[in-house]
Amino acid sequence: GIATFVLDSNSARGCRKQEKKVKICKNAYLHQGLGHIPDAYRALDLLSTHPRIDPNRIAVMGFSIGGKAALYASVKRFQKMWGTPGLDYAASVPMYPPCNATFKEDDEITDTPIRIHVGELDTYFPVDSCINYIARLKAKGKDVDIKVYPDTHHGFEGKIDGKKTWKTKGYNDGKCYYEENPSLP
């Protein structure tokens, strides 16, 4: 069988849905979603101790900022900082993640297969940054791939009241690129 575990990093940080609107968690963006990565490692720790879960078959999937956690959980530097030695996800499925931040050693990843899914028309996060990141990882021989869905936006699988929606107003990182200061430890 398959078991699922839903991790809600946003509510723990004071960001909750209000009625049918989503409240943006500004702290997630201020720190480029890095706080969600340790959350993903703690979920892996918890799941790996469950007697009915095979710790070698746990995958991670995240959406938007959560997709960033799913994507970068395989970065060896972050695993060393926040992960548990010897414990790794079996697969990663980031859904429309922000790939527009470059971190030190972010191309030094584990052998976790990564499959990114993005919408061609996503204006929240630049799709080209995910394509470029995947190219860097493939050049290192990693098992990574990206699926770009034509004519789709950020949050393409989401529905409100059974209808496809797309919000043009709100936080938009679409033309921003970030790079970690290489002089920091």
What residue spans do the PLM features occupy?
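Primarily recognizes the serine-hydrolase "nucleophile elbow" in alpha/beta-hydrolase
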Residues: 31-110
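Serine-hydrolase catalytic machinery in alpha/beta-hydrolase-like enzymes
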Residues: 1-49, 160-185
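Histidine-bearing beta->alpha loop at or near hydrolase active sites
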Residues: 150-155
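Short phosphate-binding/catalytic loops that engage adenosine nucleotides
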Residues: 2, 53, 142
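Short, solvent-exposed loop/turn and secondary-structure capping segments
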Residues: 16-18, 72, 104-107, 127-128, ...
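Conserved alpha/beta-hydrolase "acid-adjacent" motif
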Residues: 123-132
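Short beta-strand/loop motif that positions the catalytic acidic residue
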Residues: 116-118
